[in-house]
Amino acid sequence: MAANTSSRAGVTLHNGAVMPWIALGTWEAPPGQVGRAVEAALASGYRHLDCAHIYGNEREVGEALRASRIPREELFITTKIWNSFRTDQQVRRCCAKSLSDLGVDYLDLLLIHFPVGGRRALKECWQTMEALVDEGKCKAIGISNNYEDDVADLLSYARVKPACNQIELHPRLPQDALVEYCKRQGMVVTAYSPFGRGARGGMLDHAVVAAIARKHGVAASSVLLGWSLARGVPALPKSVTPARIAQNNSDEVRGLALDADDVRALAGLEDGARFVAFFNHQSR
C-alpha cells in the first residue's frame, strides 16, 4: 500500500484528502464552553475538529460551525461511532445524528471509537461504514484505540481500507511499533491526549519537557506537539482557553526543530503510562 505523504498543510490520507496537522479535541469540553472553544479555534486558523457521538456536545459544535460561515470544503471533521452501535441500523442512526447535530452533509473521517463488541459485530459495523462511504456520507473511515492484531483482523476483510488509527500518544507512551505498523499499512496515526491528561499528572509540567522548552524558548505544549508532528503524527490537543487554543496551532509548534539530544531525552521518558481509561478488548 502506498505511503502517506505530508506537507506543511497536513498529511494526505489514502483517499487524497489532506488532514491538517492539529485538530481541536472536543472530549470533555463542557456545554457552554465547547462552542466558544470551536469559535476560538476557527478564528485562530484551525480547520480540523475531532468529535465523537459519546462526547454529547456535537450540536453545540455544529452551532459554532454554522456561525463561522467557513465553507464546508475548508474543514476536516472527524467523529466516532460509540461502542453500543454495531448493527447496520444502529451505525446508520449514530452517523445520521452526528451529521444532523454538526450541521454537515458529510464527514471527512468516521472512526470506530473502540474495538469492542466481538469480531462479528465489528465486521458488520465496518461494512456499514463502507456503505456510508459509497453513499457519500463520509469521505474516509478508520479506527481508534486499535492494537496491531485488531488492525490485522480488520484488514483481512475490509473492502475500504482504514485511513486512520487514533490512539493515545505522548513521550511516556510513544507506541513506536504500533505507529510504524499502521504507517506500513498506509494508515495515518493521530494522537489524542498529546499532553497526557492535562497539566496535573500529565506531561506539561514534566522537568524534561520544561527543560527542552526553555532551551528553545517555546511553550511546553509546543515541545509535545512538535514531537508528535516530527513523527508524522497529527495531534488532537484539547483546550477551552482561547490563548492556549491559538498556541497549540501556532507557527511555534510547526516551526520547532527538536535536535538529537531533545529526541533522546524525550525517548527516555517512555514508561507505558496511559492517562485515558482504556476499554478492554472483548473476545473475538
Report each predicted region and the residues it spans.
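A structural motif
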Residues: 46, 104-107, 138, 162
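A short, structured active-site edge motif that brings together acidic residues
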Residues: 72-86, 106-115, 169
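Acidic-and-aromatic substrate-binding clefts and catalytic sites of carbohydrate-active enzymes
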Residues: 29-32, 51-60, 84-89, 117-120, ...
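Short, acidic/polar
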Residues: 29-42, 87-102, 149-152
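Beta/alpha (TIM)-barrel catalytic core signal, keyed to glycine-rich beta->alpha loops juxtaposed to Asp/Glu
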Residues: 114-284
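Alpha-helical scaffolding within the catalytic cores
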Residues: 3-11, 59-65, 93-97, 148-151, ...
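CE4/NodB-like, metal-dependent polysaccharide N-deacetylase domain
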Residues: 91-112, 131-135
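N-terminal binding-site loop/beta-alpha segment at the start of enzyme catalytic domains
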Residues: 1-75, 196-198, 265
